[in-house]
């Protein structure tokens, strides 16, 4: 399976820097990168999607066409920008924005019906990991119960919460074991990405694991040169 690199800007990128980054990345890449390189700016960092060398996605959207949902963007906003790729289930939205499993199920179903490409994020907390691998498997299995694992436009990103933003990536053995388990659950055509303190130093090694189909990258992608280096490892 072709390896993938995704950049999640979170809410860290200044608006005009984000715009400049997207335009410069478009100049750097080639058409064959379109299905292999994804960028998720925040809402103000999005641009009308005329990019041909990478896929532009949104970090979040409310599961309605439009309406009285103060502070949200909806499918109509994204479709107007020609954006049809969406992150769902990121741990920061689960924890900080209190997005429940039932709401994530609703969001997934809505955007599945719109035929969006969905990057669905899962991952366990350190307390679960410390209980042993059986507990991890049960937890991840529960996180996947609410979505259609045979959806053809699905990408799953495994991000252990204890590794996000901590500068402590999961060990290669942990990634190997966890991805091996998840591959048994997922449709064989569904890409499975790893995220969690990925950086220029460890990206190539993680990509070398057969069951890792790509990377979802946070802070290490915020500088374009770093992201370009990681893309070169694909």
Swiss-Prot record:
Catalytic reaction list: D-glyceraldehyde 3-phosphate = dihydroxyacetone phosphate
Active site per UniProt: 90 (electrophile), 159 (proton acceptor)
Transmembrane segments: none
Enzyme Commission code(s) on record: 5.3.1.1
Chain positions recorded as substrate binding sites: 8-10, 165, 197
UniProt KW Nucleotide-binding keyword: no
Example of a GO cellular component annotation carried by this entry: cytosol
BP GO annotations: gluconeogenesis; glyceraldehyde-3-phosphate biosynthetic process; glycerol catabolic process; glycolytic process
Isomerase listed as a keyword: yes
Matches recorded under CDD domains: TIM
Pfam families attached to this UniProt entry: TIM (PF00121)
Subunit: Homodimer.
Function: Involved in the gluconeogenesis. Catalyzes stereospecifically the conversion of dihydroxyacetone phosphate (DHAP) to D-glyceraldehyde-3-phosphate (G3P).
Identification of the protein by name: Triosephosphate isomerase
């Amino acid at each position: 399976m072709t390896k993938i690199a995704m950049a999640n800007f979170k809410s860290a990128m200044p608006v005009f820097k984000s715009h400049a980054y997207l335009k410069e990345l478009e100049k750097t890449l080639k058409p064959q990168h379109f299905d292999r390189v994804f960028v998720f700016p925040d809402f103000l960092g999005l641009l009308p999607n005329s990019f041909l060398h990478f896929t532009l996605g949104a970090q979040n959207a409310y599961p309605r066409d439009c309406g009285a949902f103060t502070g949200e963007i909806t499918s109509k906003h994204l479709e107007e920008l020609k954006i049809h790729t969406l992150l769902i289930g990121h741990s920061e939205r689960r924890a900080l924005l209190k997005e429940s499993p039932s709401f994530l199920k609703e969001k997934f179903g809505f955007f599945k019906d719109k035929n969006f490409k969905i990057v669905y994020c899962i991952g366990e907390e350190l307390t679960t990991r410390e209980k042993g691998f059986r507990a991890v498997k049960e937890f991840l299995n529960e996180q996947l119960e609410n979505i259609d694992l045979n959806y053809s436009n699905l990408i799953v990103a495994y991000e252990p919460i204890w590794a996000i933003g901590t500068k402590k990536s999961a060990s290669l053995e942990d990634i190997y074991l966890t991805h091996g388990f998840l591959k048994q659950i997922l449709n064989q055509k569904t890409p499975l990405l790893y995220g969690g303190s990925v950086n220029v130093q460890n990206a190539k090694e993680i990509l070398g694991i057969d069951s890792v189909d790509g990377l979802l990258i946070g802070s290490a992608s915020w500088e374009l040169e770093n992201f370009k280096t990681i893309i070169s490892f694909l």
